[in-house]
From Swiss-Prot:
This is Protein ATP12, mitochondrial. Present with 6370 molecules/cell in log phase SD medium. Pfam families: ATP12 (PF07542). Transmembrane segments: none annotated. Exists either as a homo- or heterooligomer. GO terms for biological process: mitochondrial proton-transporting ATP synthase complex assembly. It comes from Saccharomyces cerevisiae (strain ATCC 204508 / S288c).
Length: 325
């Protein structure tokens, strides 16, 4: 199943230190927010620019007839950067409560943009939904960084050298990192190949791995069959879920981690056993190399610890937004 992965072989740690991350051949760097700054007079834009608290009361307004819940400041519905109301379905009442809690917990002191991770992601989900409606103003699509097709093509590039497809050399960390990667990654890779077959007419879905002991320092690229299956999977997602996939992939540098998060927040009764996991294991999979670096060299204060908390926060935020009640 993994013809290029032989026992006892393991990607050079130094490869990933010298190169930020392997991407598909000739690809431009990813991982940045492509949303164009805009001056739409909304609460989220105002907070982003002033970093100051300007409200007294946070509340939820339930519209029973429409089955919607609006997040409000002083009786006015909070709007996204593109001017859409932060309104969710009644089925997402837990999400609405957590959004309210996020705003209620803010202090009166200077507010940092990362203080509202859940609101930021939900706003992205809502704006992506609205910009994918037929007849949407092209300028709004440009402000959010492109439509769903643009996002899908960007995310596909992460599959070429996915974090979970990059294997370290056997001589690093006395082979312990490679053994941990074999134990954690290989079952997930097999499960992912089986999962992608559901979105392809081809049965020979094989993910190309990047093994330092075999391939050395080079790029990596998935087959068209794999890419087409992955793109078909993304096409099956709602704009809301696509935004969550995007957030997870950008956080973990792993398309596979994005799929794991989304699929484990649905009904998992029919999910392939190898793909069943929890959020902490997704965080571990995405940061396995860093874990071993810290164990050997120690933690760099205000770097490793901050990065670890940041990744955990983003993964759990995405999980909350993806949760299906």
């Amino acid at each position: 199943m993994l013809p290029s992965l032989r026992k006892g072989c393991f990607i050079v740690n130094s490869i990933r230190l010298k190169l930020p991350r392997f991407y598909s051949l000739n690809a431009q760097p990813l991982g940045t927010d492509n949303t164009i700054e805009n001056n739409t007079p909304t609460e989220t834009n105002r907070l982003s620019k002033t970093s100051q608290k300007f409200w007294e009361k946070v509340s939820l307004n339930r519209d029973v007839e429409k089955g919607k819940i609006a997040l409000q400041l002083d009786g006015r519905t909070i709007k996204t950067p593109l001017g859409n109301g932060i309104i969710v379905d009644n089925a997402k009442s837990l999400l609405a409560y957590l959004l309210k809690l996020e705003w209620s917990s803010l202090s009166s002191l200077s507010i940092k943009t990362h203080s509202l991770p859940l609101t930021s992601l939900v706003a992205r989900c809502i704006d992506l939904q609205m910009t994918n409606e037929p007849g949407c103003d092209p300028q709004l699509v440009a402000k959010i960084g492109g439509n769903s097709d643009v996002i899908k093509n960007q995310l596909l590039r992460y599959l070429d050298t996915d974090t979970l497809l990059v294997f370290s050399p056997m001589n690093e960390f006395e082979g312990r990192l490679r053994n941990a990667q074999n134990e954690l990654y290989i079952p997930i890779i097999k499960g992912m190949e089986e999962f992608l077959r559901n979105f392809s007419s081809e049965s020979n879905i094989r993910l190309q791995i990047l093994d330092a002991d075999i391939h050395g320092l080079r790029g990596n690229q998935q087959s068209d069959i794999v890419k087409n299956a992955a793109k078909k999977y993304m096409s099956s997602l709602s704009p809301w879920d696509l935004a969550i996939l995007e957030k997870t992939v950008l956080t973990t540098k792993s398309f596979i981690c994005g799929v794991l998060l989304l699929e484990n927040k649905k009904d998992t009764a029919n999910l392939i056993p190898a793909l069943k996991t929890d959020m902490d294991n997704i965080v571990r999979a995405a940061t396995l190399e860093t874990i071993f670096q810290v164990e050997k060299w120690g933690e760099v204060e205000d770097t490793h610890d901050v990065d670890k908390r940041d990744i955990r926060r983003k993964i759990h935020t995405a999980a909350i937004a993806a949760f299906k009640q």
